[in-house]
Amino acid sequence: MSDATPTVENTNIEQTNIQSNSHDMKLLKVISLLMDYPSHELFADDTLDVCKDLVKNSRLISPAVRGEIADLIDSLTNLGELEAQARYDSLFERGRTLSLWLFEHVHGESRDRGQAMVDLMAQYEQAGFAIDAKELPDYIPMYLEFLAYQAVATGDEMQVRMDIADVSHILAVLGARLIDKQSEYASLFKALLQVAGQPLSLIDDELANMNKSEAVKLAEDSLEAIDSEWEEEMVDFLGA
C-alpha cells in the first residue's frame, strides 16, 4: 500500500459519530469500508460478516448487486488479509485509470483540482466532519463516509443521493474498467449508481465506449503494421 492511500479508520459499522438505525445509510459505510484498502481492521472480529448482513438487508440495491457484493466479501474472507491487500494493490495502486480520487478524473493535475479540494474540505468542516490533515478529501471511500455521516446528521437522504448522482459519470467509468478487469470490486460502483437512482446502463455505455476505443486502436495498429511492412518491402525492392 502506498503512503498516499488513506484509510477510513472507523471500521465499526454499528458505531458512528451519530447513531443511526437506517440500513440504507449504513450501506454507504459498508461500501466505503469495502472500497478502502483492506486493512487489518477489516478482517478483525466479525466486520466482514456485519457488512454482508447489512448488504443482504439493503433496500437500495437490487438482489443481483447484493449478490455480487456478497461475492466480493466472500472473496476477501477466502483470500485473507495479505492476499486481499496484494490484489487491491494490483488494481488500484497501478496508474490513474482506477484512481479512487474523484478530482483526479475531473481536473487531472491542474490548479482547478486544488481549489476543488479546498471547497470540499470547507464543506466537511462546515458539517463538523473531521479528517486527518494529510488525507485528501476527494478519496471516494472518505467521501462516502462523509455522505453517510451527513445523511444521519441532517436526515436528508435525498441530498445524499443527489450528491452521489453528481459524480455518477466517474463511478460508471470506474465500474466499467473494473468489469473489464473481471474484478468483483465493480459491484460497489454498481451499488452506488443504484443508491443514486442512476441506471446501470451508464456502465454499459462506458464499456461500449471502451470497446470502441480499443477497436480504433487495433485498427490504427494494424494500419501502422501494414505501412511498416509496405515500407520494408519497398526498401527491399529498391535495394534489389
What are these regions (language model features)?
Residues 2-240:
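Charged, alpha-helix-forming regions
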